[in-house]
Amino acid sequence: MKSGRFIGVMSGTSLDGVDVVLAAIDETMVAQQASLTWPIPVHLKKGILDICQGQPLTLSQLGQLDTQLGRLFAQAVNALLAQQRLQPRDIVAIGCHGQTVWHEPTGEAPHTLQIGDNNHIVAHTGITVVGDFRRRDIALGGQGAPLVPAFHHALLGHPTEKRMVLNIGGIANLSLLFPGQAVRGYDTGPGNMLMDAWIWRQCAQPYDKDAAWAKEGQVILPLLQKMLRDPYFAASAPKSTGREYFNYGWLERHLAAFPGADARDVQATLAELTAVSIAQQVLLNGGCERLMVCGGGGRNPLVMARLAALLTGIEVSTTDKAGISGDDMEALAFAWLAWRTLAGLPGNLPSVTGATEASVLGAIYPANPITQS
């Protein structure tokens, strides 16, 4: 089995930066050693948002964005190597999720598309890359997402305690870790995505720091109820979603019935939407003893307070309390998935994604032996 140092690279739906994590991994442990977040330039962020919202673009523009993101991911990896004074030969492989620009796992031709050319990452780092993790699961009839519940189970599963792990990124997803039961998990709906989109349009701020703006507003109950009637929330698992569905256009359609709504009230309502839609799914699955939160939403004090209030009797805390950085969880998961791919081990859980079978995931982009030796 391949073991040693791996690097995980994650650029999620929040677009708040490229998370890069260094970890030592083998069959018995995942030990995080270092991490950093690398900024995404404004022009790349705009290009990603345009695609995700269905804006037309040429194949040339898509190809350029693919290349530019691959180079950006390589820069982020090289920055971590320099920070830690490591050489390419010190790293077994990079697990790179890529940037999701479209996710449509149902219909006549299910598909998902992550860009950020892995060939450029190999060329500019000299390290083997494992990427394209989601499409094998979709080819096997699955949703292609979420993939992190398997990692949550490996790190945070407990033999007797009924736990759930909640990742609040752009989209929120829930992992159900119940003793004696198959792991389940799915996307509950919007996490930070709509809150970030609204404050960006209104205030040109990337996110609502400490929920300060939302705290100034009041929840618009009819708007909240209208949004919660979206059929996605009532759909049965397995299910997954993304920015191609819960985007600014989705929000605008719901706001059309509320002309003149105060911008701060809308922000407060979006925070409540995230908390309520998550809490409903926690309770629908019978609750748990401990809800462990990771992702950027774990730093939103309003969302965290509302979850605690809506889920009385459940301990709501971040994964940091368990010794695992909530900010680095997803990048760490893809480092682990790269290890599993190189070890010939399956990376998906059919009980989560709905795939017909467990499978080794991803494609391997080998480094030239002369550079990784």
Curated annotation (Swiss-Prot):
ATP binds at residues 12-19. GO terms for molecular function: ATP binding; kinase activity; phosphotransferase activity, alcohol group as acceptor. Pathway: Amino-sugar metabolism; 1,6-anhydro-N-acetylmuramate degradation; Cell wall biogenesis; peptidoglycan recycling. It comes from the Bacteria. Keywords: ATP-binding, Carbohydrate metabolism, Kinase, Nucleotide-binding, Transferase. Its EC number is 2.7.1.170. The keyword RNA-binding does not apply. The keyword Kinase applies. Gene3D superfamilies: 3.30.420.40. SUPFAM superfamilies: Actin-like ATPase domain. It catalyses: 1,6-anhydro-N-acetyl-beta-muramate + ATP + H2O = N-acetyl-D-muramate 6-phosphate + ADP + H(+). It holds the Pfam family AnmK. One of its GO terms (biological process) is 1,6-anhydro-N-acetyl-beta-muramic acid catabolic process. PANTHER family: ANHYDRO-N-ACETYLMURAMIC ACID KINASE. Catalyzes the specific phosphorylation of 1,6-anhydro-N-acetylmuramic acid (anhMurNAc) with the simultaneous cleavage of the 1,6-anhydro ring, generating MurNAc-6-P. Is required for the utilization of anhMurNAc either imported from the medium or derived from its own cell wall murein, and thus plays a role in cell wall recycling. Belongs to the anhydro-N-acetylmuramic acid kinase family. This is Anhydro-N-acetylmuramic acid kinase. It comes from Salmonella paratyphi A (strain AKU_12601). The gene is anmK.
